[in-house]
């Protein structure tokens, strides 16, 4: 099973790449995390937020098209469901049992296009705080690793 993180944005600071890579390398080979970066759209007087989100959505759709047809889509959104780490671990176990890959979508500065959110199987809120998009990558990778550690009774998670 592959966990794809499809994120708008590129050229992240080194500390974000280091943090993200730290958690992805800890994942077992049968549950690897792959980052797919999507170029952000530049906002201007002729590009309002809706236009920006639509153009970024087209790029995200192109990435989703390269993943398996049975890929489950989880869109990160401030209005999404709040899951505990244990609930995420339960979801991860269920996804593994069902088979297929999972794509986590991280939008750009304006968020995800409403059509993408409507297409998602799940809307997930990673935090009630406003976070830099690069940091969300690191937090998501860490939480996926932590969820996996819960399923394995690994001592990393000590709640």
UniProtKB/Swiss-Prot annotation:
Pfam family membership, one: SPOUT_MTase
Binding site for S-adenosyl-L-methionine: 76, 107, 126-131
Localization in the cell: Cytoplasm
This protein's record includes keyword Zinc: no
MF terms (GO), sorted A to Z: rRNA (pseudouridine-N3-)-methyltransferase activity
EC number(s) given by UniProt: 2.1.1.177
Reaction catalysis annotation: pseudouridine(1915) in 23S rRNA + S-adenosyl-L-methionine = N(3)-methylpseudouridine(1915) in 23S rRNA + S-adenosyl-L-homocysteine + H(+)
PANTHER family, A to Z: METHYLTRANSFERASE, RIBOSOMAL RNA LARGE SUBUNIT METHYLTRANSFERASE H
Name of the protein in its database record: Ribosomal RNA large subunit methyltransferase H
Gene name tied to this protein: rlmH
């Amino acid at each position: 099973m592959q966990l794809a993180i499809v994120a708008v944005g590129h050229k992240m600071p080194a500390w974000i790449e280091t943090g993200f890579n730290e958690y992805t390398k800890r994942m077992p080979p049968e549950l690897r995390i792959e980052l797919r970066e999507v170029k952000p759209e530049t906002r201007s007087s002729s590009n309002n937020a809706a236009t920006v989100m639509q153009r970024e959505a087209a790029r995200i759709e192109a990435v989703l098209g390269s993943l398996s047809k049975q890929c489950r889509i989880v869109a990160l959104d401030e209005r999404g469901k709040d899951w505990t780490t244990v609930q995420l671990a339960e979801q991860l176990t269920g996804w593994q049992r069902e088979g297929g890959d999972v794509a986590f979508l991280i939008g750009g500065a304006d968020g995800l296009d409403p059509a993408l959110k409507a297409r998602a199987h799940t809307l997930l809120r990673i935090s009630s705080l406003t976070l830099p998009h690069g940091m969300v990558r690191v937090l998501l990778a860490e939480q996926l690793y932590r969820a996996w550690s819960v399923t394995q009774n690994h001592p990393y998670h000590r709640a």
